Structures are given as structure tokens and as C-alpha cells.
Regions:
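C-terminal motif of bacterial Sec signal peptides marking the signal peptidase cleavage site
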Residues: 20-23
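Bacterial signal peptide processing site
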Residues: 25-28
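Blade/loop signatures of beta-propeller domains
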Residues: 34-52, 58-95, 271
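Extracytoplasmic beta-rich repeat domains
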Residues: 96-115, 143-161, 187-203, 226-248, ...
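Structural signature of WD-repeat beta-propellers
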Residues: 125-126, 155, 164, 171-172, ...
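WD40 beta-propeller blade core
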Residues: 131, 177, 217, 262, ...
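Short loop/turn segments that connect beta-strands within beta-propeller blades
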Residues: 134-138, 180-183, 220-224, 266-269, ...
Length: 444
């Protein structure tokens, strides 16, 4: 086993789990009749207090109406990671609760967000077992162990993506693996020489995957052949996990753990532009950890990306010119809906910003400590996602919250037996949560 793989076990992990969610009406809260105007590890960047812009006072946020979302074929939804405003039922109730396999432990970490395609739900547990389930009732269809015999099971993996009847997996043993979605049969394997901690992105019969050494591979979806590669700056230290590439309009945007953000032509890997979201600040314990762990978004010709180093920026997809930037750091993926962005900061603030101007409209401080008086028990949050006029986040203390996207007001919350580290997903009017102990719960 490579030294990189061995070292990955030494990273600190959060031992948290999601249990059965109850009281869904309370959790979702009461829908407002009229909108009002308006981390995982101890060395995450700490920021100064963020406040709404004075020029934003009295601004009324207007969002597009929620629409049905049939599939969630890769981490972050679709290849561009722009999911906007999705619909879920008004009175969610638990439909089923299943185990997908092995969860997180001292040596293993559950990393893969579930994906949904063609009425099937696909998961990968911490031991690289990929399974397919019926999304309507949670019944297992097939299960496939893809770890080679010569490798250990306790490796930290990447994630999943679906396209053209195939499920693609990035793994901790340095292989991208393609499986037949109907049967789980392995179709091809491609050795990329280093572990992967982020999910692949599949678009146009190409599969894009980033290794922990900051090397981007573009593979042929049918054969696994290497079409081209691109190398970023290799980092000695980075955060656990990583951002998946975003693909749209013939461009792939690669987020590297160095804080680099690089745009390349999908066809041949030609570099169009490069930027850095390192955002080094004096006195920070993580000035060298500029990792872009949240997935970048491509939406209507603009790239939105946030780094742990304290930079949140909007960049022109074609030219690489910055449109706006904010000194906000985070490791969770931003969420875009209409003309607004919602993002969780490293300081546990949930923030609403303007898509075109970066103006801050509201800031809601989420609970930061289990024991606020003694500042003990740091709470981490995952999300947000936007569904039926509610921003949904989940935390390491076993609490999920819904907040108004119009003003940040808390609409509802529910106590759960354990916590959540993987952002929930929405497909077929269902809201799905995956716990650290590998329990998957569906609400519809």
C-alpha cells in the first residue's frame, strides 16, 4: 500500500451518525405566507464576524418556484452542480430506513453522497461496497464489492456518478471503476496512481476524477481510456475529502486542494484560465490549508467557488475574470437558486448573497458549540440544500434545521439520535439523509 494511502488513516474524523428522523412537520416548519425582506476539524479557518451589507437593507429575496427533480446522478446533483429550487412534499413522512453497509470508524470514513438515476438509488459504503436500491421502497437490487484482493478494505474513498447506464466510482486504492448500473458487473478499471477523496463527474461520455496529488484525469466513459490529464500544485497537507469537478458548456472546472481553480476544455484539456482562492490571512491556524473542498458551481456562464482559505468568488467561465469576491471561507458546497447563493461558512454562519453582485442580504449564526459557555464540543454543519422554500442543514450534534431562504429565520428543527456529515439529497419528491453509521432514511 502506498504511503499516501497509509497517511490518510491518520486524519482526524468525526464519529457521528444520523438516526431516525421524527416530527417532520415540526422539522420543515410552517411555510411563510409571504416572504419577508431581507469544521469538521479543529484547524478550520476562523473568520471575523460577517454582517449583511447596508445597501441590502429592505431587499426582498424572490426565488423561482420549486420544481420536481427526478434524478440526482452525481455528487452535487448534476454535472454543473446548479440544482436551484427543488420540490418535496408538504407533509414529509418517513417511507423507509435501510443500512447501506459499513459506516465510519476509527480507520474508515463514509464519504460518498448517494446518487439517484432511473428509479434506482446507488450508494458506496466505507469498505467500497457499491449497492443499488429501489428508491420507492429501499429494497436492495444488487451489491458489489470492488476492492481488489491485494488491497485493504479500510481505505477512504471518493464517491459515485452515473451516466449512460453506468455507475462510476472513485476509490482510495487509486482506481476509477465503472459498473453496469443494471447488474453491478464491473465493466472496466483504470489505475490513476493515487487515492481519490472526491466523487467523479460524468458528462458527455467523459469521466473526470481528481487524485489527492491534485491530478485531474479525463477518462473515456465507455472504455476507461485516459483522454488527457492536468496537474495542479501538489499539497503535502490537505483536508479530508475534496471537491468534484464542475462541467458545463464544454468546460471543466477543477478544484484543487492547493486552492487552485482551473478551467480546461473538455475536449482536450487545454487550460483556459487559472485562479487561486488561497486567501492566506495572518494569525490563522490553517493558512496553508486553502483546500477547495466544496464543489464549484457553473451557472449561466459564471463559476462560483469557495475555499477553506477564506475566499468566495464569482468568476467568468470563459475569461477567468473575477466578477466579485468575498472574504468568506468554507468547506461545504454553495447552493444557487435563481439570483441568489446560500453558503455555510467555517464560522458556522449561513449566508445569503446576490448571484451577480456578491451582496450579503442576511446572515444567520448557527449553533457553534455544544457547550457555548465553555466553548467546548465544536459543532459542524453540512448543507444547505433548498427544497420547497426551506433551506435544510444538518449538524454533528444530531440536529437538523430548516430555515427560511428569504430572511434566514429558523422554521423548524428536530433532534436526531446522532449527526450527519454528508449533505442530504432530493429526488422524486423525496428527501434522503445518510448517516455516518451508514443508515439511509427516505422521507416523502
Amino acid at each position: 500500500m502506498s504511503q499516501i494511502m497509509k497517511n490518510s488513516r491518520l486524519l482526524m474524523m468525526l464519529v457521528i451518525a444520523l438516526g431516525v428522523l421524527t416530527g417532520c412537520d415540526t422539522f420543515l416548519g410552517t411555510k411563510e405566507a409571504k416572504p419577508l425582506p431581507g469544521k469538521r476539524i479543529s484547524i478550520l479557518t476562523q473568520q471575523r464576524s460577517i454582517e449583511p451589507d447596508a445597501s441590502a437593507l429592505g431587499h426582498k429575496i424572490v426565488l423561482p418556484a420549486p420544481v420536481p427533480n427526478e434524478d440526482w446522478p452525481q455528487a452535487g446533483g448534476y454535472a454543473n452542480h446548479a440544482m436551484h429550487h427543488m420540490r418535496v412534499g408538504k407533509a414529509l413522512q418517513e417511507r423507509w430506513n435501510i443500512s447501506i453497509g459499513q459506516g465510519s470508524s476509527d480507520e474508515e470514513r463514509l464519504m460518498a453522497q448517494p446518487i439517484v438515476a432511473e428509479d434506482r438509488l446507488y450508494t458506496m459504503d466505507s469498505e467500497t461496497v457499491i449497492s443499488a436500491f429501489n428508491i420507492k421502497n429501499g429494497d436492495e437490487i444488487w451489491s458489489s464489492e470492488i476492492t481488489p484482493k491485494e488491497e485493504d478494505d479500510d481505505l477512504i474513498n471518493g464517491g459515485l456518478a452515473y451516466e449512460n447506464g453506468k455507475v462510476f466510482a472513485t476509490t482510495g486504492f487509486g482506481q476509477v471503476v465503472a459498473l453496469e448500473a443494471k447488474s453491478g458487473k464491473v465493466l472496466w478499471r483504470r489505475n490513476v496512481g493515487a487515492p481519490m477523496r472526491s466523487a467523479p463527474t460524468a458528462r458527455g461520455n467523459r469521466v473526470f476524477a481528481i487524485t489527492v496529488t491534485n491530478k485531474l484525469f479525463a477518462l473515456h466513459g465507455q472504455t476507461g481510456a485516459v483522454l488527457w490529464t492536468h496537474s495542479g500544485i501538489e499539497e503535502v497537507t490537505n483536508l479530508l475529502g475534496g471537491g468534484s469537478p464542475a462541467v458545463d458548456s464544454g468546460v471543466v472546472v477543477a478544484p484543487y486542494s492547493s486552492g487552485e481553480l482551473v478551467a480546461l476544455k473538455v475536449e482536450n484539456g487545454q487550460e483556459l484560465w487559472a485562479d487561486s482562492l488561497s486567501g492566506v490571512r495572518r494569525g490563522s491556524a490553517s493558512t496553508t490549508l486553502s483546500t477547495i473542498r466544496g464543489r464549484p458551481i457553473i451557472d449561466r456562464g459564471i463559476v462560483f467557488a469557495i475555499s477553506n482559505g477564506g475566499q468566495f468568488a464569482a468568476i467568468n467561465l470563459r475569461t477567468g475574470r473575477r466578477i466579485w469576491e468575498r472574504p468568506i471561507g468554507g468547506i461545504e458546497s454553495p447552493w444557487i437558486a435563481g439570483e441568489y447563493l446560500f453558503v455555510l461558512s467555517n464560522n458556522t454562519d449561513l449566508i445569503a448573497l446576490g448571484r451577480l453582485n456578491g451582496r450579503i442580504y442576511w446572515v444567520t449564526a448557527l449553533p457553534k458549540w455544544e457547550d457555548p459557555e465553555d466553548r467546548e464540543g465544536k459543532i459542524t454543519w453540512t448543507g444547505p440544500i433548498l427544497a420547497s422554500d426551506r433551506l435544510i442543514v444538518a449538524g454533528s450534534t444530531g440536529e437538523a434545521m430548516s430555515l427560511s431562504p428569504y430572511n434566514g429565520r429558523t422554521l423548524g428543527k428536530v433532534d436526531m439520535p446522532d449527526g450527519v456529515t454528508i449533505s442530504p439529497i432530493v429526488a422524486k419528491d423525496s428527501l434522503l439523509f445518510l448517516s455516518e453509521d451508514a443508515e439511509l432514511v427516505s422521507y416523502r
